[in-house]
Amino acid sequence: MQGLSTDGGLFVPEEIPKMTLQEIEKLIDMDYPNRTAKTLQKFLTDYTEMELGESAELAYNWFDSPSKVPLSILVKNPKNSKSPICIMELWHGPTSAFKDMALQILPRLMSLALKKVGETKEILILVATSGDSA
């Protein structure tokens, strides 16, 4: 495993997986961990559905809201729209920062990746704030 690509940049998918309208509509009724697992399945094809589901469930168990990512309605009936305008509350994780959304599942996925390639060493993930979350 390596953190940066050989050219010094970040790893990005060669192509972005497509989702049908039906697949997207199915996500609506799912809780956040299941929605996360279903979405990640499109990108992380070397993980099983069970691995992604368990990783997401464990990652987001620590959030202090039952819905994990509540929506707050800002405008109930905006002009020219059938849907309210909402904002996602991304501060319900263990550190109260939006970074919890990604950084709670990342170590679980990295540990699984190491096991899949037969690596027995432990990993350490060091995370620092960029200063945008006072």
Task: Enumerate the language-model features and the residues they cover.
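PLP-dependent amino-acid enzyme catalytic core
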Residues: M1-A134
